């Protein structure tokens, strides 16, 4: 798809792969912002704020017109799960997710430098994990896969066998709700017809 200078404000290879799979041309300019939640901040507000913050931060670093930022969290029993700090944190997260449904929430923002405004959305997907055995958790942690993933797992990788079902967008769980992002890019004029 043709574009008018789209910049992805993320170093995530998964987000890049998803955009590439849709035929979208873009450049990557990672934006580093503080990702700590504000006290009392609601999960949807949190991911939307971070997504827009990343998009606007990338606009300070690079040329272009449209800047796409995104942030994904896992929400389980009211806890916002970002990326685990270490193996013990990954084990704690996976134990908490074991056998219970949880939500993956991805906020995305497309900042339009020309119009000086942003489209900001959040998409929720419900994920159901099977009951995990301790050795499954430890084996998965040993792969190193959990450490750069919200909730300590990647549905598209080594954790696929842990997921019984999902309700909602699969690509949202991967890290970017592609259907909604492509629609938003089209609506704001970043893509051709």
From Swiss-Prot:
Its EC number is 3.6.1.9. The active site is at residue 71. It catalyses: dTTP + H2O = dTMP + diphosphate + H(+); UTP + H2O = UMP + diphosphate + H(+). Its cofactor is a divalent metal cation. It holds the Pfam family Maf. Keywords: Cytoplasm, Hydrolase, Nucleotide metabolism. GO terms for cellular component: cytoplasm. InterPro entries: ITPase-like_fam, Maf-like. It is found in: Cytoplasm. SUPFAM superfamilies: ITPase-like (SSF52972). The keyword Nucleotide-binding does not apply. Disulfide bonds: none annotated. The record marks 14, 72, 156 as: Important for substrate specificity. It is an enzyme of class 3 (hydrolase). Gene3D superfamilies: 3.90.950.10. GO terms for molecular function: dTTP diphosphatase activity; UTP diphosphatase activity. CDD domains: Maf (cd00555). Its main location: cytoplasm. GO terms for biological process: nucleotide metabolic process. The keyword Cytoplasm applies. PANTHER family: BIFUNCTIONAL DTTP/UTP PYROPHOSPHATASE/METHYLTRANSFERASE PROTEIN-RELATED (PTHR43213), BIFUNCTIONAL DTTP_UTP PYROPHOSPHATASE_METHYLTRANSFERASE PROTEIN-RELATED (PTHR43213:SF5). Belongs to the Maf family. YhdE subfamily. Nucleoside triphosphate pyrophosphatase that hydrolyzes dTTP and UTP. May have a dual role in cell division arrest and in preventing the incorporation of modified nucleotides into cellular nucleic acids. This is dTTP/UTP pyrophosphatase. It comes from Citrifermentans bemidjiense (strain ATCC BAA-1014 / DSM 16622 / JCM 12645 / Bem). The lineage of its organism: Bacteria, Pseudomonadati, Thermodesulfobacteriota, Desulfuromonadia, Geobacterales.
């Amino acid at each position: 798809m043709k574009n008018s200078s789209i910049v992805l404000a993320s170093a995530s290879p998964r987000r890049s792969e998803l955009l590439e799979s849709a035929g979208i041309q873009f450049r990557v300019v990672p934006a580093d912002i503080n990702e700590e939640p504000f006290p009392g901040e609601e999960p949807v507000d949190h991911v939307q704020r971070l997504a827009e913050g990343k998009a606007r931060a990338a606009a300070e670093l690079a040329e272009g017109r449209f800047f796409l930022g995104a942030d994904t969290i896992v929400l389980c029993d009211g806890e916002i799960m970002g990326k685990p700090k270490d193996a013990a944190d990954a084990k704690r997260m996976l134990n908490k997710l074991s056998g219970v449904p949880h939500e993956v929430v991805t906020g995305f923002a497309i900042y339009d430098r020309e119009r000086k405004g942003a489209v900001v959305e959040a998409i929720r997907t419900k994920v159901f994990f099977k009951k995990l055995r301790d050795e499954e958790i430890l084996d998965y942690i040993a792969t190193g896969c959990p450490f750069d993933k919200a909730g300590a797992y990647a549905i598209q990788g080594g954790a696929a066998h842990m997921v019984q079902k999902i309700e909602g967008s699969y690509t949202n769980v991967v890290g970017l709700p592609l259907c909604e992002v492509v629609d938003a890019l089209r609506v704001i004029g970043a893509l051709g017809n």
